[in-house]
């Protein structure tokens, strides 16, 4: 199967390299911005990508909602499988994209958007075939988890913990989606879509860690507790689904507190 790649940044280049050694897959054309010369087999329009002979799948590595959404719809309507790790795209337009994929009988795959290297969404999609999911949630953002742990174990202030996370590559140059809880909210929304075949879009609440200070941490620890940013979703009245993200206090011995810079998901 020949796979086209949209974008040739760190993620796109990594996908292209992986395709060279993946059994049953073949490197296809790469969509890049005009003037970007370092991409192999490059094309500068989605029309050229879709017209390329033999392309059966498209892997999106651009990020953001547009033009990723327009490109995704074009690929699906052209009968191409579409793969993405773009949680913002899926959270905003997942229902439309899934419907377009079903109409054409192709795959719309987004497991990489939640859980990092864990095949969480794939396994969840299998579980819902035979089990009722009463609720699910957990620690879905490694950046904030690292920061909270640094503030608690190493007595760093918020700004110091954020700077440390950026230096080590946990946090991006613009960490706002992470620290505000928006990244975790997008991931729990995707999880809810798989678990309940419904996107919770109304009245979603997310509280991040920006307001947590070193003094807060001292008071929390004095009570034998520890803080983690938790996401949760489940069925609600009226056939709806709830989803939220907020800091939660746990006993310091709780399993959640042993997770330092990774994710933890419970169903």
Predicted regions mapped to residue ranges:
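Short, ordered loop/turn segments at secondary-structure junctions
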Residues: 33-35, 63, 87-89, 95, ...
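Glycine-rich adenosine-cofactor-binding loop
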Residues: 2-17
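NAD(P)-binding Rossmann-fold cofactor-contacting core
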Residues: 22-39
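Rossmann-fold NAD(P)-binding glycine/threonine-rich loop
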Residues: 87-108, 121-124
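Rossmann-fold NAD(P) dinucleotide-binding segment
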Residues: 46-57, 61, 65-85
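Substrate-binding/catalytic subdomain of NAD(P)-dependent oxidoreductase enzymes
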Residues: 162-255
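Conserved small/polar residues in nucleotide/adenosyl-binding loops
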Residues: 265-267
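Conserved anion/nucleotide-ligand pocket segment
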Residues: 126-186
